[in-house]
Amino acid sequence: MSKNLKKYWKSEIELTNSDQVEALRHNEFVDKLPIDSILEDKKSLQDSSTNRRDFLKYLGFSTSAAVLASCEGPVNKSVPYVIQPERIRPGIANYYATSMFDGYDCANILVKTREGRPIKIENNKLANYHGSANARVHASILSMYDSARIQGPISNGKDISWDDFDLEIIQKLDALRFNNKPVVLLTNTIVSPTTSKIISSFTDKYENITHVEYDSISESSVLDAHEIMYGRRAIPYYDFSSAKYILSIGADFLGDWLGSNYDGEYAKGRIPVKSKDSKAYMSKHVQIESNMSVTGANADIRIPMKIALQKLFLAHLYKKVASLDISLPGLDSVHKLKLEEIYNELISFGKSALLVCGIDDVHAQILTNSINDLILSEAKSSTKISLIRKGDSKKVNEILNKIKNSEISGIIMCGVNPVYTLPNSNMFLDSLSKLELSLNISMKMDETTSSCKYVAAASHYLESWGDFQFVNGEYSICQPTIKTLFDTRQFDECLLKWSGNNTPLYDVLKDNWNSNILESNFSWNKAIHDGVYSVKDNFKPKLVNIDFSDSIKKLIDYKVEGFELCLYSKIGMGDGQQANNPWLQEFPDPISRVSWDNYLTISKKDAESIGLKNYNESNGALNSNYAIVSLGDSQLKLPVLIQPGQTNGTVGISFGYGRSLGVKAEMMTGSNAFMLYKNFSKVQDVKIKPHHEIHEFACVQLHNTLMGRGDVVRETTLEVFNTKNKNHWNPIPVVSKNHIETAVNKKEVNIWEEFDRSIGHHFNLSIDLNACTGCGACVIACHAENNVPVVGKREVRKSRDMHWLRIDRYYSSDVSFSEDKENKENINGLSDSLSVFNEMEDPNENPQVVFQPVMCQHCNQAPCETVCPVAATSHGRQGQNHMAYNRCVGTRYCANNCPYKVRRFNWFLYNNNDEFDFNMNDDLGKMVL
């Protein structure tokens, strides 16, 4: 039998402070029971005439009364249809194909509606590209049912009608055009062919208007590099399913890199598939990065490295691939060996290899493109390009300077929030008030909208018509799934109206598709039904001769004096557009397992040198010191999270938090990292000093500890998988039979009667841990499907989170190097041995990571069923574990007896409860239930 020598641990504290964690494991209740207050009046208790028999009688009656009362069903009053719509059958869901793009996230999706209400997002399997929804796309449905939405047009702080609003705006625009005063139309990236035509018509009428696209988190380095090398400003498209060797240098492609939707393609290559030689093959993934990312957590080999060293490493790699005879600063012996190994693998895999790079530097992107071209990588598409990022930071800076110098007289904005996302937002805010026209087309009264003279209430994408082209040749349609909830209007409709075009947007959209997109054999109705449509539109690059030696010189000319700050976006919060979404606020980060916060990630070594600590008060209550991060005149105070795998000398902060307007008070969490986003660069040279305050995190990484589990995760290498019998890496469970450990089948040891499985269906759900990347989309989907309540940060700290599905994240390291003879024998040279021994000495430096989704297993003989005193939980004939809520009296015996620790209890009534002011306490928010 194979013995797994790895040690699995959930946090740095669990690894280093076993006594504290052991005490927390046995602490069933976070709050102590108020025994002292119960026994406070001892005299009255002593003088009581109630005897033991009477006490038990009262107790028995109260328990019986509770059980009887619990059997009363709730009464819900409903209002029926006056006239039943023909196509709507009560209880039967309808699905509509549509698409979503908010300037940051995009997806081709299906929307589940019930009685005319959109209630859930699903993937559109007909889509060739971007056919899956991430956590934020799943949660976006709740953003429609947000009572904080603007409900009509506003002029100078007063509600007015659309007719009066249009009249005022047209008069302003005509006056500015007549006087030839410049106006800026500032939007997020536009990927809609129809919207692009409408904007073109609008700027043709008003020639003084300049359209500028602005991405809150810029990808200009990638776009500029592609334009320099291939003649078009776009993002390369990567097919991870066809890559057998993936080298990523700083690219979190399973996170938010380039608006990524690569999870599905990546997962296809990670599932071992047998070939003709009967061996299974899967892609090999090497990740070089500074922050511990979701992509790094999924890599076969992860190499922590500072950005400055990443640039030098990339330059050396290009030198070897291109066979250049140039002089470069040297690498240390460890990284020299890594370089040689990676180079040899890259060349041996050749066209099956792929290099992706997340370094925010145009020269790094140029070298990356060139390496892929030199190895003839087939995973980097030669015909497809991604169009979901177009923002040009140079043009945005030019506009900002013109606004500052009073060279701009008006601004119209849509899909952007520069007062929040610009590092120099105070300057922009001061200039905004001086403009003759300041207009924002927005759904929320956010930081920018609240400072504008005119506000056009925008519709949600689920209330809108539109189209998108995320990838060249791949079109998708956005159609409304519900009538507008408020007196709102789309951006396109506003521009049509102000251009003097009264044609309905639907007709403009349909005419554009019939004239310019659809072929004669494909109908408009079919396109709406499918939601997607493909045409042959291959990208033809225009190759340009480039002096790559100049890029190498500029790339390596980079030095950092203090800490290297790496700004990034979380899978949950993104760029902060959905900060008022409670599902996303309570969503635990896949790596840190922290919800309701952002923080400064730092390595254990650096934290100790500065004097920063983390410590647990309970299984959900992680406390930490604050730190002051300084960059020039800007300072940001954040709590510190000691992150295993963080590169020494680097720190990380996520965007998307620190919102101050347009969100409920409960959602005003974290700090605004955009303050440190100088020159639209994700890497900054910062100074850090400790602060005396203590911060309280809601961190679920020690929740639901599985007791008595040795090998928490069954895993092995591909080589062992191919060469050994499955019982070697997945041993058969044994029991003691006649004092001998014997492998027996289930029937021999089962103490319960078997269920009859010969009738009806028997449901089963399997999760392929090779394919799971830990992205958490399923967690939000489960929230939506099962109406799971949001409990808030305070309750999460008490281990009272209500997620029915959780994704456990385990770090792993070897327990004892002396026991691992095979590893010792495979050591190659002094450098390798030092590296291996260092890993054994401090697993925190670079642990391996594994994700494990856990939900109700619907056990055949479920332990929760046998201990319930009132039979509230029972077993169905189709194998499911059933729950009768109105029978439950809350003993929580089932939670105590669940080996997977997936039982959830509502400690309060969250519906219509002002203490939990989230979507269930909101008349509009409850529409998603």
Please state what every model-predicted region is.
Residues V184-L186, I246-G250, L354-V356, S409-G415, ...:
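Structural motif
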